[in-house]
Design a protein with these regions (language model features):
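Conserved PLP-binding catalytic core of the aspartate aminotransferase-like
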Residues: 26, 303-311, 318-356, 372, ...
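Active-site phosphate-binding strand-loop segment of PLP-dependent enzymes
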Residues: 153, 157-214
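Conserved N-terminal alpha-helix of the aminotransferase class I/II PLP-enzyme fold
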Residues: 64-112
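Active-site PLP attachment segment
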Residues: 232-267
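Structural motif of enzymes handling amino- and sulfur-group chemistry
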Residues: 280-299, 305, 309, 318-323
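Conserved PLP-anchoring active-site segment centered on the Schiff-base-forming lysine
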Residues: 120-139, 160
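PLP-dependent enzyme catalytic core of the Aspartate aminotransferase-like
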Residues: 60, 68, 72, 96, ...
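N-terminal "arm"/small-domain region of PLP-dependent enzymes with the aminotransferase-like
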Residues: 8-76, 210
């Protein structure tokens, strides 16, 4: 049998519908300056789908730093992996500043966040070790766990009773062996907006022996007094053995870092395959990230504006009776309960985008249980009160249409809209 034959009629739950909704629900094109309002299909929309939490993507100081660095160095310098020929004083300065910011002795730059996490997990454990991880962990964690040749146990999301149960299993398994236990969770979960119970997990170190690895992609820059993340917010940063974040969210950039004890970071620097065998972060990104970190540290008003918008948006949704779960972070899920199928889902999103000019992410099966529908909003520092008020009014109206079964049982006329946008 041809290896590729299995892909002819089975493209996955989303890919199977690709021909019905190309360029609209999947692979949409947002155009113009990265902002609270952007162009989609030829019309301006309020955009709630970008993780530009602090508005740094188009901050004038950031744009200047990026442009100046690109003009001076181009995109190629430095060439090669860090360990061979791709290191620089600026790479090391960024690592030093990141370590100081999150209160760790050392930090290591990653040329990309997702594969950095995958590679780090692969590098930290052997077949003798056991991984214990949260059930709602991000895909980069799940992919890293899949590479593990030893045992792995998953605990129910933020369920400390089940965590203790899995830790007992893991402890029994490594007893009398050269193996140890790596616990992996998130500081802020990107779908639900829940914070990981880092403080409670760390307290369990009194009962179990393990090391804690935290992915704080959504917490870095948004949580804690200074923006140093979920560990700072919960007052337990010292108990996090390895702290990870990408630059793709609050920093609005590319790359990432891991922070922790110097001896562990030294091991990763010399052994982490995604860094040892790949080109280092280009200089414009390094200098641009230095500027972004500087603004994150020196302009608290950016985080204050973000949280003004978070409170206004989430408070307004709750006042109108929307279920936004138990989020206590900027990530804002809106759950629309009922037995919603593909037709209702696509009609609702089409209505929001075409008639209310609102662009947000939609999440459905298999990410959440079948029949449910979740709209995910990411408020940022560049959103306005008007953006929020228009969105609240729109959500109230489309929910009423959904409840009254107003939407037709067919796919929306996306092709006609797309054709009009190209005229």
């Amino acid at each position: 049998m041809d290896l590729f034959a299995k892909f002819e009629n089975q493209l996955g739950p989303i890919g199977n519908e690709a021909d019905k909704v190309p360029g609209y629900f999947s692979f949409p094109k947002l155009e113009g300056e990265i902002a609270n309002r952007m162009m989609f299909q030829g019309k301006e929309r309020i955009v709630w789908s970008l993780n530009n939490y602090l508005g740094l993507a188009n901050h004038p100081e950031v744009r200047k730093a990026d442009a100046d660095a690109a003009a001076q160095y181009g995109l190629a310098y430095p060439m090669g992996a860090r360990m061979m020929s791709g290191n620089s004083n600026n790479h090391e300065l960024l690592e030093k500043n990141l370590a100081e910011f999150v209160g760790k002795p050392d930090a290591m730059l990653l040329n990309y966040g997702y594969q950095g996490m995958v590679s780090a997990i692969d590098n930290l454990v052997t077949r003798h070790d056991v991984i214990v991880y949260d059930a709602e962990s991000h895909a980069c964690i799940l992919d890293g766990v899949r590479l593990h040749a030893g045992k792995r146990y998953v605990f129910k999301h933020n369920d400390m009773e089940d965590f203790a149960k899995q830790m007992k299993r893991a402890t029994a398994l490594v007893e009398g062996t050269p193996g140890g236990i790596l616990v992996i969770t998130e500081g802020v979960f990107g779908m639900s907006g829940n914070m990981g119970k880092l403080d409670e997990i760390i307290k369990m170190k009194d009962q179990f022996e393990f090391r804690l690895f935290v992915d704080d992609a959504h917490g870095f820059g948004t949580m804690g007094k200074t923006g140093a993340g979920a560990g700072e917010e919960l007052g337990c940063m010292d108990g996090i053995d390895l702290y990870f974040s990408t630059f793709a969210k609050s920093m609005a950039s590319i790359g990432g870092f891991i922070a922790g004890e110097t001896k562990i970071l030294k091991f990763l620097r010399y052994n982490m395959r995604s860094q040892v065998f790949a080109k280092s972060l280009p200089m414009p990104l390094v200098l641009g990230n230095l500027k972004r970190l500087e603004l994150l540290r020196t302009k608290p008003e950016l985080k204050e504006k973000l949280w003004h918008n978070v409170r206004r948006l989430q408070g307004g949704l709750r006042e109108r009776g929307f279920d936004i779960g138990t989020t206590n972070t900027p990530v804002t899920p809106v759950f629309l309960h009922g037995n919603h199928d593909l037709y209702e889902t696509t009609q609702l999103i089409f209505d929001l985008r075409e008639n209310y000019h609102i662009f947000c992410s939609v999440v459905m099966y298999p990410v959440i249980p079948k029949g449910q529908l979740m709209l995910r909003l990411i408020p940022t520092a560049v959103h306005t009160d008007q953006d929020i008020d228009e969105t609240l009014n729109a959500f109230t109206e489309v929910r009423e249409k959904l409840d009254n079964k107003t939407y037709p049982r067919e796919l929306p006329p996306i092709q006609s809209v797309a054709a009009a946008a190209t005229v």
